[in-house]
């Protein structure tokens, strides 16, 4: 899997503050800012504690700490993480997993936007960037979308390919695809 190299930008690491991008940092691309996303979108090669904390806050309510980690996926060298930063703060994240099925090579997992930053287009911007990457690879994307996120995915061109189903302890979902 190849990811484009972008212009110089910044990434946030909890223990070191904001660092300039260089070959030793985890970030491999920086995209231009979008309205409402002051610092823009950043591809990262590994998941950090801020990413796990946001996943836990948004996606794992009522579940034990540690459930926000995806064993085997977060450590897979093919997995990438697209994060949205505003003012140096992680406000949105997603995991792009290589998980092939007919017409789709990638799967979106762990898509989360901080409650304080919802309804600003951050989630759509993340999804559209994931779609751009998949399109460049000549493939589609699939996901298990929570019911409340289905309208956003539809606005981004995804279609429902399943009836509603429940993921125990997490809630109701639709299987969705974009090709």
What do these predicted regions represent?
Residues 127, 134-146:
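Conserved GNAT acetyl-CoA-binding A-motif
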Residues 55, 153, 158:
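Conserved active-site tyrosine of GNAT-family acetyltransferases
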Residues 76-78, 102, 167-172:
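Short acidic/glycine-enriched loop/turn segments that link adjacent beta-strands
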């Amino acid at each position: 899997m190849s990811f484009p190299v972008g212009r110089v930008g910044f990434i946030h690491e909890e223990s070191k503050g904001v660092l300039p991008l260089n070959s030793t940092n985890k970030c491999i691309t920086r995209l231009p800012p979008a309205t409402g996303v002051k610092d823009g979108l950043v591809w990262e090669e590994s998941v950090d504690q801020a990413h796990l904390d946001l996943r836990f806050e948004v996606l794992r309510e009522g579940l034990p700490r540690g459930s926000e980690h995806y064993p085997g996926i977060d450590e897979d060298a093919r997995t990438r993480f697209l994060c949205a930063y505003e003012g140096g703060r992680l406000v949105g994240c997603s995991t792009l997993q290589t998980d092939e099925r007919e017409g789709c090579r990638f799967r979106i997992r762990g898509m989360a936007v901080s409650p304080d930053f919802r309804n600003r287009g951050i989630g759509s911007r993340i999804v559209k960037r994931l779609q751009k990457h998949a399109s460049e690879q000549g493939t589609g994307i699939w996901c298990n979308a929570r019911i409340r996120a289905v309208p956003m995915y539809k606005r981004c061109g995804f279609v429902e390919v399943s009836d509603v189903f429940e993921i125990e302890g997490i809630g109701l979902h639709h299987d969705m695809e974009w090709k």
